[in-house]
A protein has these predicted regions:
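Active-site metal-binding motif and surrounding structural segment of the metallo-beta-lactamase
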Residues: 67-113
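Active-site neighborhood of phospho(di)ester-bond hydrolases with catalytic His/Asp-centered motifs
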Residues: 52-55, 87-94, 113-114, 169-172, ...
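Active-site environment of divalent metal-dependent phosphoester hydrolases
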Residues: 15-17, 59-60, 95-101, 175-177, ...
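Short, electropositive alpha-helical surface patch
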Residues: 61, 70-76, 107-115, 168-172, ...
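Metallo-beta-lactamase
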Residues: 71-86, 116-169, 212-229
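Cap/insert and terminal regions of metallo-dependent hydrolase folds
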Residues: 67, 183-263
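Conserved beta-strand hairpin/beta-sheet module of binuclear metal-dependent hydrolase folds
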Residues: 13-76, 179-193
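Core dinuclear metal-dependent hydrolase active-site scaffold
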Residues: 8, 42-45, 51, 156-185
């Protein structure tokens, strides 16, 4: 098996406060204060294949929530040389607006999503206020169309997309929240997506404010620790890019980092 290189792309950002991102923050007895939140998607590739992990928020989804766009995802994918027309597989870690907003950029791609995630967002509770605010209806409809067209690939608990790339359902944040494990030249990389928004969340067992099942989220932290990856990539932490090899030139300079050598 040829190992992969992972590229982390920061396409958006916002500023908020700690009590807005940590569940029941007042219980920790700590002062509130400012915190950043960055928005990422990921590209996994070697000489044989390219796999896209999430697609970022759309212009509409970002504007509806006053998020700042740093680079349009389409431009970022093109800068990386991702052949969108070739239909590379797309992993949907979960169906929130900031992860599936640009599925239309990949009209021929198979979409891989946990069955629990798809079932929830097409089920009877998806319109309830406390969960619905995190999605865009037309983007959920895109998943429905992909299912009708035969492009949606659901899995129960785990699936190997290719040698060295595994997707595992963790739950917690959403019913089908998934993570992606990738074998690279620099060891095993775990793309935690929103199973871990912030490194502090993971290290201090401080769940994010948006949670479908709190106990599953706590259990998810333990499951990720048990996996003992060489590198864990959080889903929204502003410190993420600084932990890895920066992309220093071109359109993505300062907005991307890599793990592993180009293969």
């Amino acid at each position: 098996m040829t190992p992969y290189q992972v590229t982390i792309v920061k396409y958006g950002t916002r500023r908020t406060v700690r009590s807005d991102v940590y569940l029941n923050y007042h219980l920790y007895g700590e002062p509130d204060g400012p915190i950043g939140m960055d928005y990422f998607f990921w590209v996994v590739r070697n000489a044989d294949r390219t796999i896209v992990v999430d697609t970022g928020f759309s212009a509409t989804g970002g504007a509806n929530r006053k998020r700042t766009t740093l680079i349009e995802p389409a431009a970022a994918f093109d800068s990386l040389g991702v052949d969108r027309a070739a239909g590379p597989p797309v992993v949907v870690t979960h169906a929130h607006y900031d992860h599936i907003g640009n599925l239309g950029l990949f009209p021929d791609s198979p979409l891989h999503i946990a069955a629990a995630e798809y079932d929830f967002w097409t089920g009877p509770y998806a319109t309830r206020t406390l969960v619905h605010h995190s999605v865009e209806d037309d983007e959920i409809d895109h998943l429905r169309r992909a299912s009708r067209d035969g492009r949606l690939r659901t899995f129960e608990n785990a699936v190997e997309l290719a040698p060295g790339i595994r997707v595992l359902r963790i739950g917690g944040h959403t019913p089908g929240q998934s993570v992606v494990s990738v074998d690279t030249t620099d060891g095993v990389v775990l793309l935690a997506s929103d199973a871990v928004h912030y490194y502090e969340e993971y290290e201090r067992n401080m769940p994010f404010t948006q949670v479908a099942n709190l106990i599953d989220m706590y259990d998810g932290f333990e499951r990720l620790r048990a996996m003992r990856p060489d590198h864990l990539v959080a889903g929204h932490d502003p410190d993420t890019l600084a932990r890895f090899t920066p992309v220093g030139t071109g359109t993505l300079a300062g907005l991307a980092a890599t793990i592993g050598e180009e293969c």
